[in-house]
Curated annotation (Swiss-Prot):
The gene is murC. GO terms for cellular component: cytoplasm. ATP binds at residues 125-131. HAMAP family: MurC (MF_00046). This is UDP-N-acetylmuramate--L-alanine ligase. Its EC number is 6.3.2.8. It comes from Deinococcus geothermalis (strain DSM 11300 / CIP 105573 / AG-3a).
Amino acid sequence: MTDSPPCSSDSASSVPSQLHYHLMGIGGIGVSAFARLLAARGVRVSGCDTQPSELTEQLVREGIPVALGHDPAHVTGVDVLIASEAVPKNHPELVAARGAGVEVRPRMALLDELLRAGPSVGVIGTHGKTTTTSMIAVAMQGAGLDPAAFVGGIVPEFGSNVRLGTGPFVAEVDESDRGFAVLSCETAVFTNAEDDHVGGNQATYWETVEQQHAAFARFVGQARRVLYCADWPGLDQLVTTSGERLNYGLAEGADYRAVDLRPDAEGTTFTVARRGEVLGEARVGLPGLHNVLNALAALAVTDLYGGNFQTAAAALAAFRGPGRRWQRIGELNGALIIDDYAHNATKVAAAVQAARQTGRRVRVVFQPHRYLRTQQSWPRLADALMGADEVLVLDIATASEPPIPGIHATLVSDRMAQSGHTGVRYAPDRAEVVRYLRETACADDVIVTMGAGDVWKLSRELASV
């Protein structure tokens, strides 16, 4: 690694071009971003995954070879093998790599290098990381700071999950991988902390929420400064070991504060103040209070790096969100079709609140995600959905988890019905869901497909895209 900023044209020439990195699981949103960043630095890159996808096809078009399936032969001629900590140590590719003297590195070690290479921003938190990271990069771009970015979603402004630039490196840091705790960055942006990615037998999950929150504290403690959400209870207790501590939010006394909020059906206009000094007016073109906070964080970070507020705010006003985060898919009989990644209770509640802001009848197609997550949070999921006018609950998206006895999607729908919701039903037949919505959708509706599984496919089917 060099001292030049990540992903710059200067740094690309400094990396020996003969190095060959092979990335397992290259079809994942994060690993594919690593592949693109490495390729931009002049490294020879290849990868493999179990199934083809739109992402793997894009990588091939970009000149990055992708093999389907896993095979020890993939490591032949490879210098470095990148694999998630979740990959079993006895996996044939890992065994073959170690036997051949190939360096095996976890993904987080690679991200650590990128964060340490120059000015950097690491975004952590249980919710809002992808949107906040995207907004920071877009705001910095608008302000002329030419950021590089690593995002856990496709950013429409970039047409990719990465951006190559010579300015600060902005990265989404995923707490589902325990390796994040040892990373170091210049500025840590801390959105919130809750109990996701905890328990069960996932190799990289945390045993307890206390352990996870201690890891959050360790991460921000290693940063030169932290910008944390003043509105989220308890975050101030997790940032006590950080160097410079700044916060943002709606709370009185926040260093960066959003005031005079004016919500409408399409988003929210608000005023930004820095320690009492008005910086100007901003707008986020996505509904929901959570998106006001995400945008405020982005404007605060841009200000900290010397960016122009007005041009940053203008860029954010045109921002329409990364893929699967309140993503407008199209229309059906005049109804607005939205797809959203919300899969835990806090995200679901935020998405429902955003839908209510549109002023339309809120109709949700919800797909619970993972048996373990459903087991841990089905009452909260049900309660979070109570604000919708109608909820169709699909079967659980398993994410390759084995079934847990007694854990079923009907736990959510039954609790809602027992709590007095008259518009909820369990709907396992997807074809019937599509037929029903096509027959009943009208211009007064917003239909939101919601979940981290493949429920997004229904939104495309409904909108005929």
